[in-house]
Amino acid sequence: MLHTFTTFFSPFSAKMMYFCSLIINAMSVKKLRFAIFGNIYQAKKSVSIQKILSFLYERKAEVCIDSEFYTFLTDGLHIDVKVDRVFEGDDFEADYVISMGGDGTFLKAASRVGTKCIPIMGVNMGRLGFLADVGPSEIEHALLAVYAGQYKIEEHVAIMVETQGVSQLAGCPFALNDIAVLKRDNASMITIRTSINGEHLVNYQADGLIVSTPTGSTAYSLSNGGPIIAPQAGVLCLSPVAPHSLNVRPIVVPDDAVVRLCVESRNHNFLVAVDGRSEKCAEGTTLTIRKAPYPVKIIKRNTHKYFHTLREKMMWGADTR
Protein backbone atom coordinates (compact mmCIF):
# COMPACT_ATOMS: atom_id res chain seq x y z
CA MET A 1 0.00 0.00 0.00
CA LEU A 2 2.88 2.37 0.74
CA HIS A 3 4.26 1.85 -2.75
CA THR A 4 0.84 2.62 -4.28
CA PHE A 5 0.50 5.81 -2.21
CA THR A 6 3.90 7.10 -3.29
CA THR A 7 3.26 6.37 -6.95
CA PHE A 8 -0.07 8.18 -6.87
CA PHE A 9 1.46 11.43 -5.59
CA SER A 10 4.79 11.36 -7.38
CA PRO A 11 3.84 13.29 -10.57
CA PHE A 12 3.03 16.49 -8.70
CA SER A 13 4.18 16.04 -5.09
CA ALA A 14 7.56 17.76 -5.50
CA LYS A 15 6.04 20.85 -7.12
CA MET A 16 3.23 21.02 -4.54
CA MET A 17 5.64 20.65 -1.63
CA TYR A 18 7.82 23.45 -3.03
CA PHE A 19 4.83 25.79 -3.50
CA CYS A 20 3.54 25.00 0.01
CA SER A 21 6.97 25.71 1.48
CA LEU A 22 6.92 29.16 -0.15
CA ILE A 23 3.56 29.91 1.45
CA ILE A 24 4.60 28.65 4.90
CA ASN A 25 7.89 30.59 4.85
CA ALA A 26 6.18 33.73 3.55
CA MET A 27 3.73 33.71 6.45
CA SER A 28 6.50 33.79 9.05
CA VAL A 29 8.59 36.78 7.91
CA LYS A 30 8.64 40.38 9.09
CA LYS A 31 6.71 43.26 7.57
CA LEU A 32 8.41 44.29 4.34
CA ARG A 33 8.59 47.63 2.52
CA PHE A 34 8.09 47.89 -1.24
CA ALA A 35 8.52 50.78 -3.70
CA ILE A 36 6.72 50.48 -7.05
CA PHE A 37 7.61 52.09 -10.38
CA GLY A 38 5.67 51.63 -13.60
CA ASN A 39 5.33 52.53 -17.26
CA ILE A 40 2.61 55.15 -17.71
CA TYR A 41 1.83 54.20 -21.31
CA GLN A 42 0.57 50.65 -20.87
CA ALA A 43 -3.06 50.38 -19.80
CA LYS A 44 -2.93 46.57 -19.89
CA LYS A 45 -0.96 46.53 -16.65
CA SER A 46 -4.06 47.42 -14.56
CA VAL A 47 -4.84 43.79 -13.71
CA SER A 48 -1.23 43.11 -12.76
CA ILE A 49 -0.89 46.12 -10.45
CA GLN A 50 -4.11 45.17 -8.70
CA LYS A 51 -2.76 41.65 -8.26
CA ILE A 52 0.46 42.99 -6.73
CA LEU A 53 -1.28 45.47 -4.42
CA SER A 54 -3.75 42.83 -3.22
CA PHE A 55 -0.92 40.41 -2.49
CA LEU A 56 1.06 43.00 -0.53
CA TYR A 57 -2.03 44.34 1.26
CA GLU A 58 -2.92 40.86 2.50
CA ARG A 59 0.56 40.58 4.00
CA LYS A 60 0.38 44.04 5.58
CA ALA A 61 3.39 45.23 3.60
CA GLU A 62 4.32 48.90 3.59
CA VAL A 63 3.88 50.11 0.01
CA CYS A 64 4.94 53.38 -1.60
CA ILE A 65 4.51 54.25 -5.27
CA ASP A 66 6.08 56.67 -7.73
CA SER A 67 3.88 59.78 -8.08
CA GLU A 68 3.78 59.72 -11.89
CA PHE A 69 2.71 56.08 -11.92
CA TYR A 70 0.18 56.72 -9.15
CA THR A 71 -1.45 59.54 -11.14
CA PHE A 72 -1.60 57.33 -14.24
CA LEU A 73 -3.33 54.53 -12.32
CA THR A 74 -5.82 56.71 -10.44
CA ASP A 75 -6.65 59.39 -13.01
CA GLY A 76 -5.92 57.50 -16.23
CA LEU A 77 -7.11 53.98 -15.41
CA HIS A 78 -9.44 54.89 -12.52
CA ILE A 79 -7.98 52.25 -10.23
CA ASP A 80 -8.49 52.62 -6.49
CA VAL A 81 -4.87 52.47 -5.35
CA LYS A 82 -4.36 52.16 -1.60
CA VAL A 83 -0.75 52.72 -0.63
CA ASP A 84 1.09 54.08 2.40
CA ARG A 85 2.91 56.83 0.55
CA VAL A 86 3.30 58.50 -2.84
CA PHE A 87 6.84 59.72 -3.54
CA GLU A 88 8.70 61.75 -6.14
CA GLY A 89 12.18 61.17 -7.52
CA ASP A 90 14.35 59.13 -5.20
CA ASP A 91 12.59 60.21 -2.00
CA PHE A 92 11.76 56.71 -0.75
CA GLU A 93 13.06 53.89 1.42
CA ALA A 94 12.24 50.24 0.80
CA ASP A 95 13.46 46.69 1.21
CA TYR A 96 12.54 45.86 -2.38
CA VAL A 97 11.65 47.74 -5.57
CA ILE A 98 9.13 46.43 -8.11
CA SER A 99 9.42 47.72 -11.67
CA MET A 100 6.34 47.23 -13.86
CA GLY A 101 6.91 47.72 -17.57
CA GLY A 102 9.72 46.78 -19.90
CA ASP A 103 13.46 47.14 -19.67
CA GLY A 104 13.14 50.92 -20.11
CA THR A 105 11.04 51.16 -16.95
CA PHE A 106 13.58 48.95 -15.17
CA LEU A 107 16.40 51.33 -16.17
CA LYS A 108 14.39 54.26 -14.84
CA ALA A 109 13.83 52.46 -11.55
CA ALA A 110 17.53 51.60 -11.31
CA SER A 111 18.48 55.28 -11.77
CA ARG A 112 16.08 56.26 -8.96
CA VAL A 113 17.40 53.55 -6.64
CA GLY A 114 20.96 54.75 -7.23
CA THR A 115 23.25 54.41 -4.23
CA LYS A 116 20.48 52.92 -2.07
CA CYS A 117 21.37 49.52 -3.61
CA ILE A 118 17.83 48.18 -3.09
CA PRO A 119 17.15 44.91 -4.95
CA ILE A 120 14.84 45.36 -7.96
CA MET A 121 12.32 42.86 -9.30
CA GLY A 122 11.24 43.48 -12.89
CA VAL A 123 7.71 42.56 -14.00
CA ASN A 124 7.66 42.45 -17.79
CA MET A 125 4.75 44.34 -19.35
CA GLY A 126 6.78 45.26 -22.43
CA ARG A 127 8.19 43.23 -25.29
CA LEU A 128 11.66 41.69 -24.92
CA GLY A 129 12.33 41.84 -21.20
CA PHE A 130 15.95 40.91 -20.46
CA LEU A 131 15.91 42.81 -17.17
CA ALA A 132 12.18 42.64 -16.43
CA ASP A 133 11.79 38.89 -16.74
CA VAL A 134 8.86 38.07 -14.43
CA GLY A 135 5.74 37.57 -16.56
CA PRO A 136 2.29 38.82 -15.44
CA SER A 137 1.19 35.24 -14.74
CA GLU A 138 4.24 34.68 -12.52
CA ILE A 139 3.81 37.68 -10.22
CA GLU A 140 2.30 35.89 -7.23
CA HIS A 141 4.79 33.05 -7.34
CA ALA A 142 7.71 35.51 -7.61
CA LEU A 143 6.47 37.56 -4.64
CA LEU A 144 5.98 34.40 -2.58
CA ALA A 145 9.59 33.51 -3.33
CA VAL A 146 10.71 36.96 -2.17
CA TYR A 147 8.79 36.60 1.09
CA ALA A 148 10.22 33.12 1.60
CA GLY A 149 13.76 34.27 0.85
CA GLN A 150 13.98 31.76 -1.98
CA TYR A 151 15.58 33.94 -4.63
CA LYS A 152 19.03 35.16 -5.63
CA ILE A 153 20.42 38.64 -6.15
CA GLU A 154 22.64 39.38 -9.13
CA GLU A 155 24.95 42.38 -8.81
CA HIS A 156 25.33 44.13 -12.17
CA VAL A 157 28.02 46.69 -12.94
CA ALA A 158 26.86 50.27 -13.53
CA ILE A 159 28.86 53.07 -15.15
CA MET A 160 28.93 56.82 -14.60
CA VAL A 161 29.89 59.87 -16.61
CA GLU A 162 31.57 63.08 -15.45
CA THR A 163 31.95 66.24 -17.53
CA GLN A 164 34.74 68.80 -17.57
CA GLY A 165 34.72 72.03 -19.51
CA VAL A 166 31.84 73.86 -21.15
CA SER A 167 28.77 71.75 -20.29
CA GLN A 168 27.51 69.99 -17.17
CA LEU A 169 24.92 67.21 -17.22
CA ALA A 170 21.73 67.99 -15.30
CA GLY A 171 20.33 64.46 -15.07
CA CYS A 172 21.39 61.27 -13.34
CA PRO A 173 24.98 60.41 -14.41
CA PHE A 174 24.67 56.66 -13.74
CA ALA A 175 23.76 54.00 -16.32
CA LEU A 176 23.06 50.29 -16.02
CA ASN A 177 23.04 49.69 -19.80
CA ASP A 178 25.10 52.26 -21.64
CA ILE A 179 26.32 55.80 -22.12
CA ALA A 180 26.32 57.02 -25.73
CA VAL A 181 27.77 60.07 -27.45
CA LEU A 182 25.79 60.92 -30.59
CA LYS A 183 25.66 63.51 -33.37
CA ARG A 184 22.91 66.14 -33.21
CA ASP A 185 20.89 68.32 -35.61
CA ASN A 186 22.62 67.45 -38.89
CA ALA A 187 23.82 64.53 -41.00
CA SER A 188 27.53 65.20 -40.53
CA MET A 189 29.65 62.80 -38.52
CA ILE A 190 31.32 63.78 -35.29
CA THR A 191 34.92 63.12 -34.28
CA ILE A 192 35.37 61.46 -30.90
CA ARG A 193 38.92 61.54 -29.54
CA THR A 194 39.08 58.51 -27.26
CA SER A 195 41.63 57.46 -24.66
CA ILE A 196 41.76 54.50 -22.25
CA ASN A 197 43.53 55.06 -18.92
CA GLY A 198 45.25 58.10 -20.40
CA GLU A 199 46.51 56.27 -23.51
CA HIS A 200 45.18 57.46 -26.86
CA LEU A 201 43.03 54.80 -28.56
CA VAL A 202 41.56 56.32 -31.73
CA ASN A 203 39.78 59.33 -33.18
CA TYR A 204 36.41 57.85 -34.10
CA GLN A 205 34.74 59.48 -37.11
CA ALA A 206 31.21 58.20 -36.76
CA ASP A 207 27.62 59.04 -35.89
CA GLY A 208 28.46 58.23 -32.29
CA LEU A 209 30.06 55.91 -29.76
CA ILE A 210 28.41 53.59 -27.21
CA VAL A 211 30.12 52.61 -23.97
CA SER A 212 28.15 49.66 -22.62
CA THR A 213 28.21 47.37 -19.61
CA PRO A 214 27.75 43.60 -19.94
CA THR A 215 24.09 44.19 -19.04
CA GLY A 216 23.76 46.69 -21.88
CA SER A 217 25.51 44.47 -24.40
CA THR A 218 22.14 43.09 -25.56
CA ALA A 219 20.71 46.60 -26.07
CA TYR A 220 21.91 49.51 -28.26
CA SER A 221 25.44 48.11 -28.52
CA LEU A 222 24.18 44.83 -30.00
CA SER A 223 22.31 46.65 -32.78
CA ASN A 224 25.60 48.32 -33.72
CA GLY A 225 27.50 45.06 -34.04
CA GLY A 226 28.79 44.82 -30.48
CA PRO A 227 29.30 41.44 -28.80
CA ILE A 228 26.95 39.81 -26.31
CA ILE A 229 28.72 39.77 -22.94
CA ALA A 230 27.69 37.62 -19.97
CA PRO A 231 26.49 39.83 -17.06
CA GLN A 232 29.24 38.83 -14.63
CA ALA A 233 32.13 39.45 -17.04
CA GLY A 234 34.26 42.30 -15.70
CA VAL A 235 34.47 44.31 -18.91
CA LEU A 236 33.06 47.29 -20.82
CA CYS A 237 32.51 47.51 -24.57
CA LEU A 238 33.09 50.50 -26.87
CA SER A 239 30.93 50.23 -30.02
CA PRO A 240 31.09 52.94 -32.72
CA VAL A 241 27.82 53.97 -34.39
CA ALA A 242 28.08 53.90 -38.21
CA PRO A 243 31.85 54.52 -38.32
CA HIS A 244 33.37 56.02 -41.46
CA SER A 245 36.03 53.29 -41.64
CA LEU A 246 35.09 49.61 -41.88
CA ASN A 247 38.32 48.79 -40.01
CA VAL A 248 36.98 50.39 -36.84
CA ARG A 249 35.38 47.64 -34.76
CA PRO A 250 33.96 47.33 -31.23
CA ILE A 251 36.59 46.86 -28.53
CA VAL A 252 36.29 45.28 -25.07
CA VAL A 253 38.25 46.75 -22.13
CA PRO A 254 38.43 45.93 -18.40
CA ASP A 255 35.61 47.47 -16.37
CA ASP A 256 38.11 49.35 -14.17
CA ALA A 257 39.32 51.28 -17.24
CA VAL A 258 38.78 55.04 -17.40
CA VAL A 259 37.39 56.08 -20.80
CA ARG A 260 37.87 59.72 -21.76
CA LEU A 261 36.06 61.27 -24.74
CA CYS A 262 36.43 64.67 -26.38
CA VAL A 263 34.01 65.46 -29.22
CA GLU A 264 34.39 67.72 -32.25
CA SER A 265 31.26 68.60 -34.23
CA ARG A 266 30.49 70.87 -37.18
CA ASN A 267 27.54 72.43 -35.38
CA HIS A 268 29.56 72.62 -32.14
CA ASN A 269 27.30 70.43 -30.01
CA PHE A 270 26.36 66.78 -29.55
CA LEU A 271 24.12 64.50 -27.48
CA VAL A 272 24.99 62.44 -24.44
CA ALA A 273 22.50 59.63 -23.76
CA VAL A 274 22.66 57.98 -20.33
CA ASP A 275 20.49 54.85 -20.51
CA GLY A 276 18.44 56.66 -23.15
CA ARG A 277 18.10 59.93 -21.20
CA SER A 278 19.52 62.49 -23.64
CA GLU A 279 21.11 65.87 -22.95
CA LYS A 280 22.83 68.37 -25.23
CA CYS A 281 26.51 69.08 -24.67
CA ALA A 282 28.69 71.79 -26.18
CA GLU A 283 31.83 71.08 -28.15
CA GLY A 284 34.86 71.32 -25.89
CA THR A 285 33.26 69.29 -23.11
CA THR A 286 35.34 66.31 -22.01
CA LEU A 287 33.49 63.21 -20.84
CA THR A 288 35.03 60.74 -18.41
CA ILE A 289 33.28 57.38 -18.15
CA ARG A 290 34.16 54.85 -15.47
CA LYS A 291 32.69 52.08 -13.34
CA ALA A 292 30.17 53.35 -10.78
CA PRO A 293 31.04 52.91 -7.08
CA TYR A 294 27.99 50.69 -6.51
CA PRO A 295 26.29 47.78 -8.32
CA VAL A 296 22.65 47.44 -9.37
CA LYS A 297 21.04 44.55 -7.49
CA ILE A 298 18.55 42.52 -9.51
CA ILE A 299 16.23 39.90 -8.02
CA LYS A 300 16.26 36.63 -9.94
CA ARG A 301 14.35 33.45 -9.24
CA ASN A 302 16.43 30.48 -8.13
CA THR A 303 15.46 28.74 -11.36
CA HIS A 304 16.73 31.60 -13.56
CA LYS A 305 19.51 30.69 -15.98
CA TYR A 306 21.12 33.45 -18.07
CA PHE A 307 21.93 31.42 -21.18
CA HIS A 308 18.46 29.88 -21.24
CA THR A 309 16.95 33.39 -21.13
CA LEU A 310 19.35 34.59 -23.82
CA ARG A 311 18.49 31.67 -26.08
CA GLU A 312 14.75 32.23 -25.63
CA LYS A 313 14.84 36.02 -26.11
CA MET A 314 17.10 35.80 -29.16
CA MET A 315 15.10 32.89 -30.56
CA TRP A 316 18.30 30.96 -31.21
CA GLY A 317 17.49 27.64 -32.81
CA ALA A 318 13.89 28.65 -33.52
CA ASP A 319 12.51 27.66 -36.92
CA THR A 320 10.38 30.63 -38.03
CA ARG A 321 9.35 29.10 -41.36
Segments from the language model and where they lie:
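Gly/Ser/Thr-rich active-site loops/lids in small-molecule metabolic enzymes
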Residues: N203-N247
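ATP/NTP phosphate-donor binding region
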Residues: Y18, A26-Y96, S137-K152, T163-P173
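Short glycine-rich anion-binding loops that position phosphate/pyrophosphate groups of nucleotides
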Residues: Y41, D103-T105, L128, T215-S217
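ATP/nucleoside-binding phosphotransfer catalytic cores, i.e., glycine-rich phosphate-binding loops
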Residues: V181, N197-H200, L246-R321
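Short, positively charged and aromatic/hydrophobic N-terminal segments
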Residues: H3, T7, P11, K15-N25
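Gly/Ser-rich helix-loop-strand patches that form or flank binding pockets
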Residues: V113-V123, F130
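Short glycine/serine/threonine-rich phosphate/pyrophosphate-binding segments
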Residues: K45, G104-A109, T218-S223
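Catalytic core of DAGKc-family lipid kinases
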Residues: R127-D207
